[in-house]
Amino acid sequence: MKQYKVSAIEVDEEASTVELEEEIDAQLAARLKPGKRVLVDSDQYAFIYILEDEEAFYAIRFEKNVWPALNEAHKLKTSYYVKLNEHTRLALVDMEEELVFLLENIRGNGNYGEAFEQAVNDAF
């Protein structure tokens, strides 16, 4: 699965724009659809939003360095859009709902690892 790291999140009252470390090719960007789910990488301290096309899945990695901005967007309950390249943005459908579910599930749950749970509690 190809992975793209989030470099920054521009938080606004209604919508937050997720910036990636690298742009996604225009042809691929045109095929991508929101996967409507968020996974957790508790070893590398990341929330991962899934994008997909007809052939594969792609990971948008929200690593610990962007959690303060992610928390700010979460508190405002904004919608999320990822900037795939200069001309293409894609809605991260169900991002907030998935994040709420995960945050509730992680609290007090040793399955994610004590260090990850503490990091999430500290950030959110």
From Swiss-Prot:
InterPro entries with a match to the protein in the record: UPF0738
Organism superkingdom: Bacteria
Give the protein family: Belongs to the UPF0738 family.
Name under which the protein is recorded: UPF0738 protein ABC2521
Organism (species): Shouchella clausii (strain KSM-K16) (Alkalihalobacillus clausii)
